[in-house]
């Protein structure tokens, strides 16, 4: 191995079935957990997602906050999310002194400013077959494994999307990571919208 080649990153793999509610609560203790949903014109899907998170994770005590960051939606995203039980914040109202940009990247860094959690999990707001496992599978390693600071989800796509999904990941993202950051080559879906981390680490990135 060339001397300038970085050592492999410590990437570990977990399964959401390892992290049921009892185990998550056992390790959570006083840790505050926020789930953040960046959303733009997701009025059709954000409601069921928030409702599921509220019933299965918020009311059970695993999650302390469900936060929807509304990115200049022109539909009823904000109203639907609020009615389902989320705290809704407009991206335009967060740190306006730094400019009012658009897009997911803008929402992600701003959400770190308004989220209350010590651990923050982000999840896409357009998932049509959502289950709380999308969040608990990411949250589990962050709560139960002391040496895990960042977690990123991957999953099998629905059969109907097999031919049309994941092309950017397989043809662009993963080859580029393998070329320029080979220590991250093991990431299955580097562009997936489900990931999380500990605030102490995220604020340094």
Q: Would you name each region that the model predicts?
A:
Residues 1-52:
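N-proximal low-complexity "stem/linker" segments adjacent to membrane-targeting elements
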Residues 51-63:
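Short, acidic, metal-binding catalytic loop of nucleotide-sugar glycosyltransferases
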Residues 64, 78-109, 114:
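Conserved donor nucleotide-binding strand/loop of the catalytic core
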Residues 70-79:
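A conserved acidic beta->alpha catalytic loop
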Residues 96-110, 130-201:
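Acceptor/aglycone-binding surface of glycosyltransferases and processive sugar-polymer synthases
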Residues 120:
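Short aromatic/hydrophobic "clamp" motif used to bind/position activated sugar donors
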Residues 124-130:
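The conserved acidic donor/metal-binding loop of glycosyltransferases
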